[in-house]
Amino acid sequence: MAGAKVKTEQIHLQCTECKRKNYITTKNKQNVPEKLELKKYCPHDKKHTIHKELKVSR
């Protein structure tokens, strides 16, 4: 049997203020086609900031 295609991809979440990649997570492209934008804690800024999705380069 052929393996099923994986619909999830690994992404980085980058802080919009300090531009550092603080989090790595997975996303299902079929269920969530738009780019993620989450409010997460940035340990470098020591506050909650908006983190935007970046693709992981392989």
Swiss-Prot record:
Species, as recorded: Brachyspira hyodysenteriae (strain ATCC 49526 / WA1)
One GO CC annotation: ribosome
GO BP field: translation
PROSITE patterns: RIBOSOMAL_L33
Protein name (record): Large ribosomal subunit protein bL33
Gene3D superfamilies documented for this protein: Ribosomal protein L33
Similarity section: Belongs to the bacterial ribosomal protein bL33 family.
GO molecular function: structural constituent of ribosome
